[in-house]
Amino acid sequence: MKATNYLVAALLASPTLISPISAHAEGFFETRLDGVRTGFITRSWNDRNYDGYNTEITAANCLNNPHGSPGRVEFTLKKKIPVLPDHDLGTRTLNGCYREWDRGNWGRVAAGDYYAVVGTFDWNRLTINWLKVVY
């Protein structure tokens, strides 16, 4: 058998080698939030909507100050609009990050500049040891 026949046989036997690569997010960033209060604004990002990927925020290892107080972690996704008030795309609650991790998903959003606003109890200082924004 010729070398090219071996190559063709190997490729046919392994469809994962020739299947299209799954879609990946256009961009992401990871950060840590330390002692933030309600109303804290994350860094912004530009979603060009080239890939059609959902916008998601994942939070892990959340802590409160004062320690042991009840937890609440919310993120409100906002789209920057010049001159007008920014567009609110809804709020997701991620309280699972106190146990392990949790994720909020806003689905596919239109191209534009975005940021998220943190929501927690007014008296709380929230720490999120690992935060990932995917867009």
Question: What is the meaning of each model-derived region?
Answer:
Residues 24-135:
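Post-signal peptide N-terminal regions of Sec-secreted extracellular proteins
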Residues 15-22:
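C-terminal segment of classical bacterial N-terminal signal peptides
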Residues 8, 19, 94-96:
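Intrinsically disordered, low-complexity repeat segments enriched in small/polar residues
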Residues 1-8:
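Bacterial N-terminal signal peptides that target proteins for export
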